[in-house]
């Protein structure tokens, strides 16, 4: 330190001489002196610099020689030169004050650096002492700066496991400090968290704590600062418990300390009121308040209640009346077998509902001017559901028709197909269920119109059968223009059994007729056809009437009268305008202008009389309309009626043509004196196959009233198709297939044998010119005529001569 102290003044003196030499250089450069003086000054400065260098190199380290002062040399000069030099130096110093400041700043920096070095040395020594003091528990802080006291208190409060460990460590350390023989203690191996607790507790007690070579055990040693804390850990816990208990107690006291008397005075009146009031008293009070509030509205509420009750009574009365009417209608239908009461009941109901829409009734018809929506029901998997659609089954007051009601007849139906009903704005369809034991039976009905409302067009409905296999034998083919089937002389429809089956039909096919639209209103009674099954209990009897109409259409339904029970499970399907494909089974062809003679079945069930529906021709009638029309096929398979005969088919009907009715129809297709079975071109576009009993050309031309055998047509299982009739703008897409048609003969009439020949009919979509034309070539008397129907080409390549039909 003495050497450093000696170096400082020499450095300071050196610092003083150097700034003095620097101004001399500045004076020589700045002042304008004589050249001689300048040279002398330069020489002096050079000599001084050399002397300084020599002194520095020769003096060695730590030894400095003081150089000569400038003023000493200047004293030897003349007075004028020295005076000038001093003035120049003062001027330079005064003109450059920053030089002095720099010198001072340099001095300050050097001194500061020295002081910093000294302070650093002192600081390096002081931390060691402080670390030792931190390890002691006097300051209650760890080497990391953590407050040990607070940490231990929080650990004791928060974690019960740590609390037990700390209490155990505290007891062991107190025992270690009290034992003067042991100067160190080694704790067993433990986790890092527990070792941290040991370190902090040892620091809190002022013990030296280290880790052994394994690093898993803590060793504590006694030091001069070792102490036992004044408060034990358990005391801190007691304090906390007491504080918590006091807090809880304080909370309780706070709740109960707020003026007990005031609280009692405030609470007791309410308590007394609540306790004193019983349920009855509360109800009485509630009633008083309620009466006071609703006193104004009581009158209105009573009136509204009275009105509601009256309305309910009226509704119940109306419902009861409707139910009674339905029961009466059903009873009347069952007893009389006529639907004349249907229109009357409907009209009576309409009179009682003038203002608002009347309730639904089973006797509703189209005359009520109500647009009925179609109903659809799927009965493919169950047979107990039937559909009953409102429909007018009569077009005049005197009608022999009957409304078909399928209540629970089909409850025993097992395999049934879908039923679909579609109603028109001015027509309704008749719906019934499917019979058991057959893939499906369908009866097509055209929607009739009242005589008061002339329609613009009539639509036909064709429903598909769901079953594609096992088509029952026997069917009826209806003429779309007339709707009349071929019947036997006794009125029963002609039913045919296909060649593939050995069964004949004993049942009959029933239908409900409905009239085509007529512009001239006239009474048009309806024709009824009964449907029966082997389970029929009695014969089905219908009333036959001769009508004055030439054209009518046929629909099918069951009839039940007082002496004729309804079949247990008969099915009738309505028609629909939906373009859906069907699988027709067999057909029986009808034509307009015919008088269907009644006949009897051979080995068959009871006879059924047919009613022929005819109407006078009108400007819009089918007879006088030459535009082309498509054929609508109606069929009713009845394969579920077996017979005991082994014939493949059986002639069951014959048709008679009367001269008067055939003359009323323009006959445009007669050839070679033949009397065509189809008596009119426009009126018989739906004809599929015919059978004649003529023996020669003269026989047909002379005998107009001779009976013509009923045509019995049967189709085997083929792809489904549809042949609808187009009236106006109605058209239905078709599918083509070629089914065989069998035209049987009737034994005992003429010379025709009892065997039939197959008739092959090719039904294809009609071309624009699809008017039906008949070409009758020579037909031998001993053979059955074979007819080929084609919509596009003439089928001339047939084995036998017969009728050839073109569309």
Curated annotation (Swiss-Prot):
Biological process terms in GO annotation: cellular response to heat
Domain SUZ residue range list: 227-298
Primary location recorded for the protein, binned into one broad class: cytoplasm
UniProt modification remark: Phosphorylation of isoform 2 at Ser-55 is enhanced upon dopamine D1 receptor activation and favors interaction with CALM1.
Residue ranges of coiled coil: 32-57
Residues that bear Phosphoserine: 32, 55, 133, 298, 361, 381, 557
An example molecular function term from Gene Ontology annotations: nucleic acid binding
A Pfam family assignment: SUZ
Domain R3H: 163-226
Compositional bias segments (type: Basic and acidic residues): 101-127, 349-358
Gene3D superfamilies: R3H-like domain
Asymmetric dimethylarginine PTM positions: 650
Polar residues bias locations: 89-98, 359-380, 422-434, 552-563, 595-613
Location of this chain's protein in the cell: Cytoplasm
Low complexity: bias regions: 337-348, 401-421, 525-535
GO CC terms of this entry: cytoplasm
Bias kind Pro residues: ranges: 514-524
Alphabetized UniProt keyword annotations: Acetylation, Calmodulin-binding, Coiled coil, Cytoplasm, Methylation, Phosphoprotein
Residue numbers of N-acetylserine PTMs: 2
Subunit organization: Interacts with CALM1.
Protein name according to UniProt: cAMP-regulated phosphoprotein 21
Organism this protein belongs to: Mus musculus (Mouse)
Gene: Arpp21
């Amino acid at each position: 330190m003495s050497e450093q102290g000696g170096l400082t003044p020499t450095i300071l003196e050196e610092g003083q001489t150097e700034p003095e030499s620097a101004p001399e250089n500045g004076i020589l450069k700045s002042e304008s002196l004589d050249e001689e003086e300048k040279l002398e000054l330069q020489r002096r400065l050079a000599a001084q610099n050399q002397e300084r260098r020599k002194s520095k190199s020769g003096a060695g380290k730590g030894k400095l020689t003081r150089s000569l002062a400038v003023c000493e040399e200047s004293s030897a000069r003349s007075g004028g030169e020295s005076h000038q030099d001093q003035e120049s130096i003062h001027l330079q110093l005064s003109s450059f004050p920053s030089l002095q400041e720099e010198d001072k700043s340099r001095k300050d920096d050097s001194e500061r650096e020295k002081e910093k070095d000294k302070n650093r040395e002192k600081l390096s020594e002081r931390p060691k002492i402080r670390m030792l003091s931190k390890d002691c528990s006097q300051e209650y802080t760890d080497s990391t700066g953590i407050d040990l006291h607070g940490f231990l208190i929080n650990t004791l409060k928060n974690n019960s496991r740590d609390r037990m460990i700390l209490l155990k460590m505290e007891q062991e350390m107190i025992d270690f400090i009290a034992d003067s023989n042991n100067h160190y203690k080694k704790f067993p191996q433990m986790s890092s968290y527990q070792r941290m607790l040991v370190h902090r507790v040892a620091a809190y007690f002022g013990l030296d704590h280290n880790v052994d070579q394994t690093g898993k055990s803590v060793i504590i040693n006694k030091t001069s600062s070792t102490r036992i804390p004044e408060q034990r850990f358990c005391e801190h816990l007691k304090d906390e418990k007491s504080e918590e208990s006091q807090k809880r107690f304080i909370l309780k006291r706070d709740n109960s300390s707020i003026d007990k008397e005031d609280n009692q005075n405030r609470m007791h009146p309410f308590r007394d009121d609540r306790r004193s009031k019983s349920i009855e008293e509360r109800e009485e009070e509630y009633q008083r308040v309620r009466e006071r509030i609703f006193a104004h509205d009581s009158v209105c509420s009573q009136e509204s209640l009275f009105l509601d009750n009256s309305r309910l009574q009226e509704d119940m009365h109306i419902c009861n009346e409707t139910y009674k009417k339905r029961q009466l209608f059903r009873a009347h239908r069952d007893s009389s077998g006529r639907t004349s009461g249907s229109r009357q009941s409907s009209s009576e109901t309409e009179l009682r509902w003038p203002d608002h829409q009347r309730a639904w009734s089973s006797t509703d018809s189209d005359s009520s001017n109500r647009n009925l929506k179609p109903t659809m029901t799927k009965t493919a998997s169950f047979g107990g559901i039937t559909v009953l659609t409102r429909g007018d089954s009569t077009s005049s007051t005197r009608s022999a028709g009957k409304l078909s009601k399928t209540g629970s007849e089909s409850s025993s139906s097992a395999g049934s197909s879908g039923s679909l009903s579609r109603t028109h704005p001015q027509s309704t369809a008749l719906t019934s269920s499917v019979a058991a034991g057959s893939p499906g039976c369908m009866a097509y009905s055209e929607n009739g119109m009242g005589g008061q409302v002339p329609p613009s067009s009539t639509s036909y409905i064709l429903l598909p059968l769901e079953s594609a296999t096992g088509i029952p034998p026997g069917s009826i083919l209806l003429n779309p223009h007339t709707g009349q089937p071929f019947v036997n002389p006794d009125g029963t429809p002609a039913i045919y059994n296909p060649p593939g089956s050995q069964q004949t039909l004993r049942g009959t096919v029933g239908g409900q007729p409905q009239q085509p639209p007529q512009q001239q209103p006239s009474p048009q009674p309806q024709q009824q056809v009964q449907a029966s099954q082997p389970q029929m209990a009695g014969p089905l009897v219908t009333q036959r009437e001769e009508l004055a109409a030439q054209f009518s259409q046929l629909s099918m339904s069951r009839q039940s009268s007082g002496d004729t029970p309804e079949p247990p499970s008969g099915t009738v399907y309505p028609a629909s305008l939906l373009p859906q494909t069907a699988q027709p089974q067999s057909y029986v062809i009808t034509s307009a202008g015919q008088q269907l003679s009644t006949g009897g079945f051979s080995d068959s069930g009871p006879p059924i009389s047919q009613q022929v529906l005819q109407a006078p021709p009108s400007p819009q009638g089918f007879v006088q309309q030459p535009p082309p029309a498509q054929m609508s096929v109606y069929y009713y398979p009845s394969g579920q009626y077996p017979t005991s005969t082994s014939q493949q088919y059986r002639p069951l009907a014959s048709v008679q043509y009367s001269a008067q009715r055939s003359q009323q129809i323009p006959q445009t297709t007669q050839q070679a004196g033949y009397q065509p079975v189809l008596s009119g071109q426009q009126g018989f576009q739906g004809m599929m196959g015919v059978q004649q009993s003529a023996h020669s050309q003269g026989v047909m031309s002379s005998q107009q009233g001779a009976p013509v055998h009923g045509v019995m047509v049967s189709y085997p299982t083929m792809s489904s198709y549809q042949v609808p009739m187009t009236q106006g703008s109605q058209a239905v897409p078709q599918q083509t297939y070629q089914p065989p048609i069998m035209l049987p003969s009737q034994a005992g009439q003429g010379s025709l044998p009892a065997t039939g020949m197959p008739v092959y009919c090719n039904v294809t979509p009609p071309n624009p010119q699809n008017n039906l034309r008949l070409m009758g070539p020579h037909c031998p008397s001993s053979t059955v005529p074979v007819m080929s129907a084609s919509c596009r080409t003439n089928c001339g390549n047939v084995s036998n001569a017969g009728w050839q039909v073109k569309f």
